[in-house]
Every structure is written in C-alpha cells, then in structure tokens.
C-alpha cells in the first residue's frame, strides 16, 4: 500500500497539481508532518500547489512560518507575495525570511519583504 501522505508531499515538491488534487480527493493528509506538503511546494516555487493546499486548510504559519522562509530563501517572489497575502509572518524567527533572501541574492524578494515590514539590522 502506498503512503498517500508521503506521496502528496512528493507531488507538492515537484509541482504536480493534478496529482496533489487527486491524492487529497482520496484522503491524503496535507497536514501530515507539520504541513510538510505546503513547505515543499513553497520551497520549490509551485504557486498553484501552494494555493490549492492553503485552500484545503494547510497551515502556512507552522514551524515559525517556515513556508515563507523557504520561498524567500529560494527566490520564489510570487509564492512569497501570496504567503504574505495569507498572513504569513515575515518577522518570524528574527526576520529569518529576509536574511535567507539576502544571503542567497534574491534582491526582489528582499525589497518586497522590507516593504512589508521586515527588519534587516538585527
């Protein structure tokens, strides 16, 4: 038997929205392992998957708003903007999202996060 919870995380990581939708329809738990599916979708920039998972109840704020940190670290501007629109806390973990975007050279993300209240000098 296939572990649908693990399968939905892998499909989310790879951006396979139709697979994610199907797995959810047959009972995959998108909240398994502290909402890992939405974290992986955010890390790899799969906005459609992130939006779907949020619409199904994924918690973007789990683990100190790790989803927005991962999206920021990897320069996924559209995902960052969406997560912020869904009340992700960009100041979580001592403004770690903007620090990750900075260290990885994602200037567009850095500018956006600062415009939304992130603090650089801590």
Curated annotation (Swiss-Prot):
<keyword id="KW-0677">Repeat</keyword>
<dbReference type="InterPro" id="IPR002110">
    <property type="entry name" value="Ankyrin_rpt"/>
</dbReference>
<feature type="repeat" description="ANK 2">
    <location>
        <begin position="33"/>
        <end position="62"/>
    </location>
</feature>
<dbReference type="Pfam" id="PF00023">
    <property type="entry name" value="Ank"/>
</dbReference>
<feature type="repeat" description="ANK 4">
    <location>
        <begin position="94"/>
        <end position="122"/>
    </location>
</feature>
<keyword id="KW-0040">ANK repeat</keyword>
<dbReference type="InterPro" id="IPR036770">
    <property type="entry name" value="Ankyrin_rpt-contain_sf"/>
</dbReference>
<protein>
    <recommendedName>
        <fullName>Putative ankyrin repeat protein L22</fullName>
    </recommendedName>
</protein>
<dbReference type="Pfam" id="PF12796">
    <property type="entry name" value="Ank_2"/>
</dbReference>
<feature type="repeat" description="ANK 3">
    <location>
        <begin position="63"/>
        <end position="92"/>
    </location>
</feature>
<feature type="repeat" description="ANK 1">
    <location>
        <begin position="3"/>
        <end position="32"/>
    </location>
</feature>
């Amino acid at each position: 038997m296939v572990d649908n919870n693990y399968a939905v995380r892998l499909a989310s990581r790879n951006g396979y929205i139709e697979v994610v939708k199907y797995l959810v329809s047959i009972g995959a738990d998108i909240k398994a392992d502290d909402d890992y599916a939405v974290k992986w979708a955010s890390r790899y920039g799969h906005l459609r998957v992130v939006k779907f998972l949020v619409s199904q109840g994924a918690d973007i704020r789990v683990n100190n708003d790790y989803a927005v940190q991962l999206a920021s670290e990897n320069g996924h501007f559209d995902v960052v903007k969406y997560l912020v629109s869904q009340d992700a806390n960009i100041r979580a973990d001592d403004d770690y999202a903007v620090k990750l975007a900075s260290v990885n050279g994602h200037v567009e993300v850095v500018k956006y996060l600062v415009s939304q209240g992130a603090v650089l000098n801590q």
